[in-house]
């Protein structure tokens, strides 16, 4: 019945908390300045919402974490290409929309922000029940990296094909471009370096 969608399943209802966050993952090798620029752009977009009371941005350093962040290992998010935007909303009695409705609105609005290819922006809502690593998580195991990546790409494509699965991401990302310089000792001598 679940497979053919005759019976819809929702394990826990959406909660209506007074906080949300947006996690930012630029491609590995990106500078903290680039991460901060994206965080500031996200902050500019979300502060246009009347329900947002305050915003705090973090780039290249872990944001203060709550119980949800403890389980999601937020304290490890300290690389230059990682950022977070923490949002405090008006108390639920002072706003008409639920935090989930606000999160959906934010998700749509931040799609318009120009970001480098391979950047992931995820709107994170505190879960109504116990915290989890992700709402939906697939772990791929295999003999070698090439096989794992090929299978992961198929799983990711399957996730992306489902309309209600949002903020699809993977942990292998896009490899950072590398610059390799070969130094010629003859040239160094010639230019007196």
Summary of predicted features, one role per range:
Residues 1, 28-34, 40:
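Interfacial helix-loop-helix hairpins and adjacent transmembrane helices
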Residues 1-28, 70-72, 94, 135:
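Transmembrane helices with small-residue packing motifs
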Residues 11-18, 76-83, 117-135, 139, ...:
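Flexible hinge/switch segments at interdomain interfaces of large molecular machines
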Residues 20-22, 39-42, 55, 155, ...:
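Extended, hydrophobic alpha-helical segments in both membrane/secreted and soluble proteins
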Residues 24-28, 57-59, 87-91, 123-125, ...:
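Flexible glycine-/small-residue-rich
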Residues 29-30, 93, 97, 143-147:
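A generic structural signal for alpha-helix starts
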Residues 34-131, 186-193:
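Solvent-exposed, membrane-proximal periplasmic/extracellular interface segments of envelope transport
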Residues 144, 149-193:
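Beta-strand-rich non-transmembrane domains
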């Amino acid at each position: 019945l679940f497979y053919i969608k005759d019976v819809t399943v929702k394990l826990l209802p959406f909660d209506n908390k007074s906080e949300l966050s947006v996690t930012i993952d630029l491609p590995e090798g990106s500078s903290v300045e680039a991460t901060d620029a994206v965080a500031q752009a996200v902050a500019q977009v979300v502060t246009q919402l009347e329900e947002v009371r305050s915003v705090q941005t973090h780039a290249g350093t872990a944001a203060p974490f709550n119980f949800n962040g403890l389980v999601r290992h937020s304290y490890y998010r300290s690389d230059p290409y990682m950022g977070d935007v923490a949002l405090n909303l008006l108390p639920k009695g002072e706003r008409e929309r639920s935090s989930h409705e606000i999160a959906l609105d934010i998700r749509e609005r931040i799609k318009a922000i120009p970001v480098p290819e391979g950047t992931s922006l995820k709107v994170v809502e505190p879960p109504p029940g116990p915290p989890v690593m992700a709402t939906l998580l697939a772990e791929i195991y295999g003999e070698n990296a090439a096989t794992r990546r090929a299978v992961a790409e198929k799983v990711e494509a399957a996730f992306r094909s489902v309309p209600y699965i949002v903020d699809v991401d993977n942990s292998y990302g896009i490899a950072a471009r590398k610059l390799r310089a070969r130094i010629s000792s003859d040239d160094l001598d010639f230019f007196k370096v």
